[in-house]
């Protein structure tokens, strides 16, 4: 089978995007696993590897244009990925010539649409992040409490206050100063809760958040199944939600969230029933177009693959330059 694929990123959270509908049959679990191994390795993978695979398939219940699956670089499957969803939204928008539609994910059908570019030649998409839950069973966590909201967890730290929230990916978030953001405690805590431990049996994404000013955040994330990453879309949304609930954020106001890989905008919404959802607005960049046989990709025969580099990363780098000057 011939394969058309894209290398994409949202805030430099990078993926290989593969549309399974181009094939007469869906890929097998074994083929997906082999592609993940061959493509995503940072040491031996294609184009320096990636944080994961984005698989686009037919929707299963007819209300969405397509379904997105997220396979992390370690082989685990994520329930959602905000940065990845933006790139899938762009792919589907250009494929189907639509600007606004919904995409099926593991737990929800999410609204997506094209948005005004963040900068010249930086394609930008806006996606819904929901549902939100603070219940321990949805994380899951075993701390002897039903919710963990702005509390010290002695097993993790005697000084840092944590909140656990699912959006729907599970996140453990702490607001910290600049020194703590970049200090050794972060890696110690993040690696502990993402290895065998009695509190978070499935691991959890961990984010440290520095408040830069009114409606301005910097979020650094250790992503479950990936490790430290340039950015995590759901982490930035979880952080924005908690900034609104616990700090001086305001519903419906745009928040600027900076990260190692760039910048996004978020807006936190409260519905009439008291639930929450977030908008995530950011780049959807295509860096490479890839074509070759499935057999060659499965075997890692990358010398037989045709790779075409776009000029989009150049424009994204120019955008980053403007951020560093602010």
UniProtKB/Swiss-Prot annotation:
Task: Please indicate if the UniProt record lists Amino-acid biosynthesis as a keyword.
Answer: yes
Subcellular localization, per the record? Answer: Cytoplasm
Task: Quote the EC number.
Answer: 5.1.1.7
> Which keywords label this protein?
Amino-acid biosynthesis, Cytoplasm, Isomerase, Lysine biosynthesis
Q: Mind telling me which residues the site (Could be important to modulate the pK values of the two catalytic cysteine residues) is annotated on?
A: 171, 223
| InterPro entries hit by this protein | DAP_epimerase_AS (IPR018510), DAP_epimerase_DapF (IPR001653)
What reactions does this protein catalyze?
(2S,6S)-2,6-diaminopimelate = meso-2,6-diaminopimelate
A Gene Ontology biological process term: lysine biosynthetic process via diaminopimelate
Q: Which domain of life is it from?
A: Bacteria
Name the residues annotated as catalytic in the UniProt entry: 81, 232
Q: Which GO terms describe its cellular component?
A: cytosol
Q: Which residues are substrate-binding?
A: 13, 72, 82-83, 169, 205, 223-224, 233-234
Gene3D superfamilies assigned: Diaminopimelate Epimerase, Chain A, domain 1
Q: Name one GO molecular function term.
A: diaminopimelate epimerase activity
Pfam families linked to this entry: DAP_epimerase
Subunit-level organization: Homodimer.
Q: Which family does it belong to?
A: Belongs to the diaminopimelate epimerase family.
Q: What is this protein called?
A: Diaminopimelate epimerase
Per the UniProt record, the source organism is: Enterococcus faecalis (strain ATCC 700802 / V583)
Q: Which gene encodes it?
A: dapF
């Amino acid at each position: 089978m011939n394969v058309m694929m894209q290398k994409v990123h949202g805030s430099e959270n990078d993926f290989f995007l593969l549309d399974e509908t181009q094939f007469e049959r869906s890929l097998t679990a074994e083929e997906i696993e082999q592609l993940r191994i061959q493509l995503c390795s940072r040491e031996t993978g294609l184009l320096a590897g990636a944080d994961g695979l984005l698989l686009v398939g037919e929707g299963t219940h007819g209300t969405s244009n397509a379904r997105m699956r997220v396979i992390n670089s370690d082989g685990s499957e994520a329930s959602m990925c905000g940065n990845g969803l933006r790139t899938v939204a762009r792919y589907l928008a250009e494929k189907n010539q639509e600007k606004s539609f919904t995409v099926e994910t593991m737990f929800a059908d999410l609204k997506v649409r094209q948005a005004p570019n963040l900068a010249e030649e930086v394609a930008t998409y806006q996606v819904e992040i929901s549902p939100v839950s603070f219940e321990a069973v949805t994380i899951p966590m075993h701390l002897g409490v039903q919710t963990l909201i702005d509390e010290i967890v002695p097993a993790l730290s005697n000084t840092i206050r944590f909140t656990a929230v699912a959006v729907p990916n599970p996140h453990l978030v702490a607001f910290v100063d600049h020194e703590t953001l970049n200090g050794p405690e972060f890696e110690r805590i993040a690696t502990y809760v993402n290895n065998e431990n009695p509190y978070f049996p499935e691991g959890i994404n961990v984010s440290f958040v520095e408040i830069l000013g009114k409606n301005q955040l910097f979020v650094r994330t250790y992503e479950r199944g990936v490790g430290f990453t340039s950015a995590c879309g759901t982490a930035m949304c979880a952080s924005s939600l908690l900034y609104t609930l616990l700090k001086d954020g305001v519903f419906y106001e745009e928040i600027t969230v900076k990260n190692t890989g760039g910048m996004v905008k978020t807006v936190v919404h409260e519905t009439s029933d008291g639930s929450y959802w977030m908008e995530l607005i950011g780049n959807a960049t295509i860096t490479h177009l890839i074509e070759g046989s499935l057999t060659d990709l499965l075997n890692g025969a990358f010398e037989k693959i045709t790779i075409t580099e776009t000029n989009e990363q150049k424009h994204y780098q120019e955008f980053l330059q403007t951020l560093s000057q602010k």
